[in-house]
Curated annotation (Swiss-Prot):
Originating gene: hisH
Main location: cytoplasm
Residue ranges occupied by any Glutamine amidotransferase type-1 domain in the UniProt entry: 3-213
Protein name listed in UniProt: Imidazole glycerol phosphate synthase subunit HisH
General function of this protein: IGPS catalyzes the conversion of PRFAR and glutamine to IGP, AICAR and glutamate. The HisH subunit catalyzes the hydrolysis of glutamine to glutamate and ammonia as part of the synthesis of IGP and AICAR. The resulting ammonia molecule is channeled to the active site of HisF.
Location in the cell: Cytoplasm
Assembly and oligomerization: Heterodimer of HisH and HisF.
Active site: C81, H188, E190
One of the protein's GO biological processes: L-histidine biosynthetic process
Ranges that cross the membrane: none
GO molecular function: glutaminase activity; imidazoleglycerol-phosphate synthase activity; lyase activity
NCBIfam families associated with the record: IMP_synth_hisH (TIGR01855)
């Protein structure tokens, strides 16, 4: 059985995620077909672009309901960048838009100005250090190194306990989130060197453990 299904809904960074899985030796498919995705053991939801556009496509294709159902059935899910934001209740981007609602919280834009009135660059692009807050199988054996971010919006969590690691960019940015079989990274692990690859490898291990169980 194929290990991981990378969900293709037209807005994902599919090439770099696929290449990362190849480097890890993990069997995978890239597909937007629900029947194909139903046969894998774990899912990755990548994403680049607008929250509103992404949710529109996921709803129209039936993938939103498929993802919710798969998670409810115990299938591991990893959201990357926009894909992580989509896991939450809603986003303010281009007007309030309902997300997948798998984790509590909302997505808001960086203010672009500090509390002292100093402007800073949005989007946030570059390498920032992770700070771990809670243990998780996704972070077992992973170092608190630097990872690569590209985003203008960040998650304000409804429950602090879902924040496994954070980074700082004027505000405290949830960088790794997780609860039960739902995980997310705001950064691009596939572009984040050894630290990012170790996190992806841990996710593959989570999926593998489920298969062997």
């Amino acid at each position: 059985m194929t290990m991981i299904g990378v969900i293709d809904y037209g807005m994902g960074n599919l090439y770099s995620v696929s290449k990362a899985l190849e480097r890890l030796g993990c069997p995978y498919i890239v597909s937007g077909d629900k029947e194909e995705l139903a046969r894998v053991r774990g899912l990755i939801l990548p994403g680049v672009g607008s929250f509103r556009d992404a949710m529109h496509i996921l709803r129209e294709t039936g993938l939103a309901d498929f993802i919710r159902s798969a998670v409810q059935d115990g299938t591991p899910l990893l959201g990357i960048c926009l894909g992580m934001q989509l896991l939450f209740d809603e986003s303010e981007e281009n007007g309030p838009t309902e997300g997948l609602g798998l984790l509590r919280g909302r997505v808001v834009r960086f203010p672009g100005v500090t509390n002292d009135g100093e402007p800073y660059k949005v989007p946030h692009m570059g390498w920032n250090r992770l700070r771990f807050h809670r243990s998780s199988p996704l972070l077992d054996g992973v170092e608190e190194g630097h990872v690569y971010f590209v985003h203008s919006y960040y998650v304000v969590p409804g429950e602090e306990e879902v924040v496994l690691a954070s980074s700082e960019y004027d505000v405290d940015v949830p960088a790794v989130v997780g609860r039960d079989n739902v995980f997310g990274t705001q950064f691009h692990p596939e572009k984040s060197g050894a630290v990012g690859m170790s996190i992806l490898n841990r996710y593959v291990g989570i999926v593998t453990g489920r298969e062997n169980g």
